[in-house]
Amino acid sequence: MDTLSNIPVFADAQWCAIATDIAFKVLCSLGAIMLVMCFAGLSVVAERKVCAYIQGRFGPNRTAIPIVAAVPLVGNFLKKNGLMQLVADGLKFLLKEDPLPKHVNKFWYMAAPVIALSPVLIAACVVPFGAYWSDGQLCPLSAADIDVSLVFALAIGSLGVYGALMAGWSSNSKFPYMGAMRASAQVVSYELAMGLSVLPVVMWVARNSDSPLCLFEIARAQQNVWFCLLQPVSAFLFLVALFAETNRLPFDMAESETDLVSGYHTEYGSFKFGLFFVGEYGHMVLGSSLFIVLFLGGWNPLPGVVWPESWGWVGAVMSLLTFIVKIAAMLFFFIWVRWTLPRFRYDQVMRLGWKALVPLALANFVAYLLIMSF
């Protein structure tokens, strides 16, 4: 400390506070990215285990790393629950041959997987994964607390479709191109319904807050009653649109195996295909986080129950754990729906978006507008 105090920059208390704040934000950014990446990886194992349970199978329970498997109790637990399968999948993607077809547009072909994954990691930095008390004020456990974080997360998160679009176009093949067109049309169709579904939430928060578009303010407004109870129609619309935005069954038109082989990533393999895979599950984690903040009370464990200020950093850790449990529950719901419902036809997906969800979202918005006017 004496050495740092001799440096003019750190001798000033103001600069020390700025440096501390920057370091905290960097750590929060890395934490948000690591949280998304870890959940994206674990979702692959969860997908296999839940699928196996639904189909009456055991799922992955044989893969073992020799050194880790030899550890008493821990090794057997990791093996039986298929957690070592995640390492095997990662090594497979890294060590497989990485072909580069001659007929592709090389630059955009290689950039597409990065474009598909990057928006998720950027948008995750504005999500409040918890809260902590500082100088008597409740502060968000996020990398960036901006007044328009809701708009930022929705806008940046939707840019992931450009990765699919670039992959389909640069592959110079009919099936990837058709998958890319489906992905872009689907995002445009359901982004409108998703945006309309959050407007009643914003209007409700605007009554008592100057920053109704801030995710932290939206979550804090649900300390007494969660918005899924106050606005169930909005929650339902957002959830259905979320399935379409993340290309999950029954809305996986962009990579429908029965129609398009593998869709926009048909020409991909090895690590680049793995990035698309992680990007899809990363979008699931981001979408689940937004749904939790908007309708499931954020870091609050139950309606009317909050973590007290006297708990200090213990309360902050508990709020983060609460959020993580809710994300896990949402991911289980995603997987459960995938292995329960059949895939829709493409015309049914478009008809549902434009002829059902958008009119219902408009009617829901007008209804809440009239209710709040009186």
Where are these regions (language model features)?
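Selective transmembrane helix interface/packing segments
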Residues: D2-F374
